[in-house]
């Protein structure tokens, strides 16, 4: 008679895969790319929650920041990239307190969060990032309107493991589309080309590399990117964008792309013999 009354299920497979992936040095992530993509094989078989709960930041497992390899900048950039990936991935979201502060320490039930970290600029910027991206998430219906069906998701780049990049579309019931491009490598990608749905232009709406969040601000496309009639990834049209190192960008599609008409070549006139 309706079971236990629950309507969502924690996606523990996704959680385990991602925690393993995030701890890897970026060089070795290319050999474990399936940790990043396998969840899409079964993402719509249940109504899933994507959990980074208290259980993932205790018992020597490390805080979210503590899971990331690299120096301070790379760790916090990794937190931002992963959080953007989490919010763009199909499914409801759950993150445990403390991640938004960028704290090193694991959760300790006997003490409070490390609020003193907010005396540091980098931790203030991380907190602002979490505030802004959560507001952005709530304001963008393609990110949450269709979380439990293929109608709300379309993969664009999934199998190119050598560069640690994934790109996919999120879509709402009115057909509005966003593209999420996430780079889990410390190497920025300029002019990164991939096939896209037939929209006229794509504008960058959010970048985790924003200077307000502690990013460099150097890896971005300030103007809308026009769709070109260049085949890529199995599509007739594509765009080339900038993806920051250990970063993510979210693009909004606008207008309708129309394939250019082929130019008619003039027939050569035959000269009389």
Please report, for each region that a protein language model flagged, where it lies by residue.
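Substrate-binding cleft/loops of secretory-pathway carbohydrate-active enzymes
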Residues: 1-28, 37-43, 104-107
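Intrinsic disorder/low-complexity signature
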Residues: 8, 13-14, 51-53, 117
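Glycoside hydrolase catalytic-domain groove-lining segments
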Residues: 24-57, 82-83
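Carbohydrate-interacting/catalytic domains
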Residues: 28-31, 55, 60-95, 99-273
């Amino acid at each position: 008679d309706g079971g236990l009354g629950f309507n969502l299920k924690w996606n523990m497979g996704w959680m385990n895969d991602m925690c393993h992936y995030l701890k890897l040095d970026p060089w070795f992530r290319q050999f474990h790319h399936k940790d990043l993509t396998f969840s899409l094989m079964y993402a719509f078989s249940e109504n899933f929650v994507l959990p980074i709960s208290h259980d993932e930041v205790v018992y020597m497992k490390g805080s979210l920041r503590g899971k990331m390899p690299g120096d301070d900048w790379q760790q916090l950039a990794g937190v931002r990239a992963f959080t953007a990936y989490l919010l763009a991935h199909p499914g409801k979201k759950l993150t445990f307190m403390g991640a938004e502060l960028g704290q090193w320490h694991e959760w300790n039930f006997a003490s409070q969060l490390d609020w003193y970290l907010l005396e540091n600029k980098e931790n203030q910027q991380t907190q602002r990032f979490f505030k802004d991206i959560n507001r952005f998430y709530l304001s963008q219906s393609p990110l949450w309107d269709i979380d439990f069906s293929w109608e709300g998701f379309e993969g664009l780049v999934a199998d190119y493991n050598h560069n640690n990049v994934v790109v996919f579309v999120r879509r709402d019931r009115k057909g509005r589309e966003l593209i999420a491009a996430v780079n889990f490598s410390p190497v920025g990608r300029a002019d990164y080309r991939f096939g896209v749905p037939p929209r006229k232009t794509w504008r960058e709406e959010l970048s985790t590399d924003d200077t307000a969040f502690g990013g460099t601000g150097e890896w971005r496309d300030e103007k809308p990117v026009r769709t070109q009639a260049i085949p890529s990834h199995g599509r007739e049209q594509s765009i080339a964008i900038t993806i920051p190192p250990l970063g993510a960008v979210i693009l909004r599609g606008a207008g309708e792309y129309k394939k250019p008409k082929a130019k008619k070549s003039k027939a050569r006139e035959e000269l009389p013999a």
